[in-house]
Amino acid sequence: MKVITTVKDMQQIAGELRASGKEIGFVPTMGYLHEGHATLLRQAKKENDIVILSVFVNPLQFGPDEDFDRYPRDIKRDERVAKEAGVDYLFYPSVDEMYPAEQTTKIEVVKRTNVLCGKRRPVHFAGVATVLMKLFHITMPTRAYFGMKDAQQVAVVEGIVSDFHIPVTIVPVEIVREADGLAKSSRNVYLSEQERKEAPHLYRSLCIAKQKIEEGERHPRNITTVVKEYIEANTNGIVDYVDIYAYPALTPLEIIKGRIILAIAVQFKNARLIDNITLTVQ
């Protein structure tokens, strides 16, 4: 595995690989890799000739009161996980390398962002879209892999790729969970011992909701009320949202039908956790 730190070198390597007919699988991350990331990397390894992993904590997607400075970083651990998963190139640029001058252009995402996490984080998806546009041009991937834990991000990225005719296939990968159901996340390290015991109730609430939908419940508010009440009864977290939308359009539903997402966000003392399930309902 080679570690690349400059845009020029990464772009040159990617260009030569594509020119020689190699298919590139790309996994963009902010580092502090866990089993969820490793799952993305292993799938990329199976489906492509070359795997490029990026580790870059992108300042543009953090708001002024968010945890950019506190976000966990451990590049040695990331290198170890990457090697074990068969990564060929680890792209590890500095902030100055990615943003050497003040941006003259940023991408504004106008759909799929005014709900769920985007509602509370107004700069987030503009930052995500901007850095991904840069990374796609730098790494020139055939396929790019994203975890469905951030299903809103997947929907936004699919929109960007479609709108700008970017020649990359987006591959969504199912959420990887701990044995007790908690979605794996770099931010789980922030949880206290008691919060870690409570956190699996997020996924349990989604499973209860799924069962009710399978039993015939079709009114979104009835489902979201059950989920909210369950979380409030079983955790000390504060429910940020419990919402049901059409997926990937992320538009409201009067009746649960078609492909839908049920998504939740819960604020614990030092960590805000998100989770979701997607279903196709007849």
UniProtKB/Swiss-Prot annotation:
<comment type="similarity">
    <text>Belongs to the pantothenate synthetase family.</text>
</comment>
<feature type="binding site">
    <location>
        <position position="153"/>
    </location>
    <ligand>
        <name>(R)-pantoate</name>
    </ligand>
</feature>
<feature type="binding site">
    <location>
        <begin position="147"/>
        <end position="150"/>
    </location>
    <ligand>
        <name>ATP</name>
    </ligand>
</feature>
<dbReference type="GO" id="GO:0005829">
    <property type="term" value="C:cytosol"/>
</dbReference>
<dbReference type="InterPro" id="IPR003721">
    <property type="entry name" value="Pantoate_ligase"/>
</dbReference>
<comment type="subunit">
    <text>Homodimer.</text>
</comment>
<dbReference type="GO" id="GO:0005524">
    <property type="term" value="F:ATP binding"/>
</dbReference>
<dbReference type="GO" id="GO:0015940">
    <property type="term" value="P:pantothenate biosynthetic process"/>
</dbReference>
<feature type="binding site">
    <location>
        <begin position="30"/>
        <end position="37"/>
    </location>
    <ligand>
        <name>ATP</name>
    </ligand>
</feature>
<comment type="pathway">
    <text>Cofactor biosynthesis; (R)-pantothenate biosynthesis; (R)-pantothenate from (R)-pantoate and beta-alanine: step 1/1.</text>
</comment>
<feature type="binding site">
    <location>
        <position position="61"/>
    </location>
    <ligand>
        <name>beta-alanine</name>
    </ligand>
</feature>
<keyword id="KW-0436">Ligase</keyword>
<feature type="binding site">
    <location>
        <position position="176"/>
    </location>
    <ligand>
        <name>ATP</name>
    </ligand>
</feature>
<dbReference type="Pfam" id="PF02569">
    <property type="entry name" value="Pantoate_ligase"/>
</dbReference>
<feature type="active site" description="Proton donor">
    <location>
        <position position="37"/>
    </location>
</feature>
<feature type="binding site">
    <location>
        <begin position="184"/>
        <end position="187"/>
    </location>
    <ligand>
        <name>ATP</name>
    </ligand>
</feature>
<keyword id="KW-0067">ATP-binding</keyword>
<keyword id="KW-0963">Cytoplasm</keyword>
<feature type="binding site">
    <location>
        <position position="61"/>
    </location>
    <ligand>
        <name>(R)-pantoate</name>
    </ligand>
</feature>
<comment type="function">
    <text>Catalyzes the condensation of pantoate with beta-alanine in an ATP-dependent reaction via a pantoyl-adenylate intermediate.</text>
</comment>
<protein>
    <recommendedName>
        <fullName>Pantothenate synthetase</fullName>
        <ecNumber>6.3.2.1</ecNumber>
    </recommendedName>
</protein>
<dbReference type="InterPro" id="IPR014729">
    <property type="entry name" value="Rossmann-like_a/b/a_fold"/>
</dbReference>
<dbReference type="GO" id="GO:0004592">
    <property type="term" value="F:pantoate-beta-alanine ligase activity"/>
</dbReference>
<dbReference type="InterPro" id="IPR042176">
    <property type="entry name" value="Pantoate_ligase_C"/>
</dbReference>
<keyword id="KW-0566">Pantothenate biosynthesis</keyword>
<dbReference type="InterPro" id="IPR004821">
    <property type="entry name" value="Cyt_trans-like"/>
</dbReference>
<keyword id="KW-0547">Nucleotide-binding</keyword>
